[in-house]
Amino acid sequence: MELIYHSANVLLATIKDVLPIIGVILFFQLVVIRKKIENLGRLVYGSLLVVIGLAIFLVGLEEGLFPLGEAMSRQLTNFHFLAKGNASLLEKIEKTGIIDPNLYFWTYIFAFLIGFSTTIAEPALIAVALKAKEVSTGAISFWGLRIAVAIGVAIGISLGCYRIISGTPLHWYIVVGYVVVICQTYFAPKMIIPLAYDLGGVTTSTVTVPLVAALGIGLASNIPGRSVIIDAFGLI
C-alpha cells in the first residue's frame, strides 16, 4: 500500500515537471507559429506514455537501482571479503582501518563492467548514435560509436572508484582529463570533434547515473576515512 501511495505521488510530481515543457511547445505552436497541431491524438497519447514511463522509471530507481548499487558497494568493500580468509590481514584491517587500494580489484572490475553495460543501454546515446550514422550516411558506425563511448565511461568510472578508495584529490583527475581532451581535440578529425563533445553530455543519463551515483555513495559510506559529501560525488 505504501508503494502504491508513493508511486501516485511520483506520478503527480512527474506531471508537474512535464507541464512546463508542454506549455512552451503549445505557446510556440499556437501563438508564435499559429498553426494547428497535427496528429493531436497521437501526440497526447505519446505524452501520456512519457509521463507514465518517467514515473515508473523514477519509482524503479528508488526501489531497485539505488539500493542495488549501494548493496554491491557494501559487499565489495566488506573487510571479510577483502581479506579472502586471510586471518592476519583481516585482523590488521580491523585494527588499523587502513586497506591497500589494490585489494579492491573486484570493485574496479565491477565499476568497469557496470559502466560499460549501462552506457551501452543508455537511450540518449542510442539516439545520438542513430542520428550520427544517419547524417554521415554510414561513415560513423552505430555500434562502433556506442562501444567506444562505453569503454571510455567504464575506464572513467573505474578511475573514479580508485580515487574514492585511495583518497586522491579530485582536481588531479580533472586537470589531467582536460589536458588529454584538449590534446585529442587538436589531433582528432574535425568531423568527430562536435559529436564527441555532445556524446560527453548525453552518455551519463537515465540508466548510468542512478547506478554510478549509488556506487559512489556506497563506497564513500563503507570505506574508513571517507566523507559521503566530499568523496562520493565526482564519478559522473
Locations of regions flagged by a protein language model:
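Interfacial loop-to-helix junctions that mark the boundaries of transmembrane helices
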Residues: I4-K16, G41, T77, I93-N102, ...
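The first (N-terminal) embedded transmembrane alpha-helix
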Residues: I15-F28, A214-G216
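Helix-loop-helix junctions within the multi-pass membrane cores of secondary transporters/permeases
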Residues: N86-A87, L103-Q184
